[in-house]
Amino acid sequence: MFELDHLFVWVSPGGPEADHLVAAGLAEGEPNIHPGQGTACRRFFFRNAFLELVWVRDPAEAQGEPTRPTGLWPRFAGRATGASPFGLALRPSHPGNGPAPFPGWEYRPAYLPAPLAIHVATGVPASEPWWFYLGFGRRPDDPGWPRPQSTDHPLGVQEITRVRLAGPGLGQPSAAARAVAAAWQVELVEASGHAAEVTFDGGRQGRAADLRPVLPLILHC
């Protein structure tokens, strides 16, 4: 069994777009950098998962080894010309290095202690999200999380319960995309442009916030 670990969105350097999530009623968590990968992020934590706004802070690192095979740099650089601005990570429902739900390879960035690795899906076009699996992943409200983060938000949301991803080619998705959709509450929809609809708590408040065009996100709570 699998769960959503987090959804990321490529944004401008410094992540000023995160301010729009704050204005929508989300409380920002601790930011992070990824040494050796050339990226940094601003994050928003919920009980079961988190949203991450990521940018490239060091193009040389992002294009060097061992990051180059991930394709992260061309995705960041091409986000305005057709590449998907999203990445989506799954994790096992219970902590532990269980098998991934899709074929892939083990990416071992410098910021992860051995033997931890990120399982990156193969056979995925740049028009689809960057699918990956964290066998070591945990819920943000798990006592074993490395650095505890607040999951309280003025908007009153608690958990991400569904993600709907729209984009070119998602009507005929890759094998990895189909595996992700089968593993958790991820819906894939064909569309001319990229967007993600994130539903919190089953949408019980009956409210929505469309953050486009600043962010390709629609929040339902």
Model-derived segments and spans:
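Amphipathic alpha-helical "stalk" segments
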Residues: 1-221
